[in-house]
């Protein structure tokens, strides 16, 4: 099956997860040829071409283009791979956000596989569309094969600021790997807060799932604290298996990120999620 078709089918399968609750009202997948709300002079394709200059419709419901503009990886210069020489996708995820008290528009483009990395290549672009559209920033945010916004997609961390939540994932027959970057915008530039690593598996005797919840907590600092809770649940199956099923169990692992004025970044109050990631690696 062609890679881009597989990604399209996977995206359809993940829609219930990606569009749950508040996410259904915030992320959209407009036709790229359509104009922005309240505008007649700018299309989403116009915005997309600021990061993929030769992007054009193939007349069959997809948009094809060559190399994107140069950009950094959100996790730093030692992360990520090269972009594909050509890419094809049906649409892009669009998310209105607040940054620095201003209205901004984020768009997420999954370009497919990287030619020199196991990770894919996904562009997160930031636009000012209040007047003449302007690309403010763009970064590769892929940290696994397929990349999306993750519900709730954004989280308010101040009266005029939102944190963005993306996810990169891949699956095999019994395991699901998910990495969730938390990204803020400062001075119209994306900054990585942290990445949350979770791991699901479904075996004959049991299934184990790790769900993630996010909460902002006002604490009197320039940006609100962000509490991340991973609920790690094990559910025994009713199947007849060689191995005895474990007992049902559930535990919450939480970390709160506080804004540190001295370092001008978010700092975790514990290494609990890092320890969970290390535990998960032993089960791969």
Predicted regions span which residues?
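Eukaryote-skewed repeat-based solenoidal scaffolds used as protein-protein interaction platforms
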Residues: 138-190, 194-199
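A glycine-rich, hydrophobic loop/mini-helix early in the fold
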Residues: 103-157
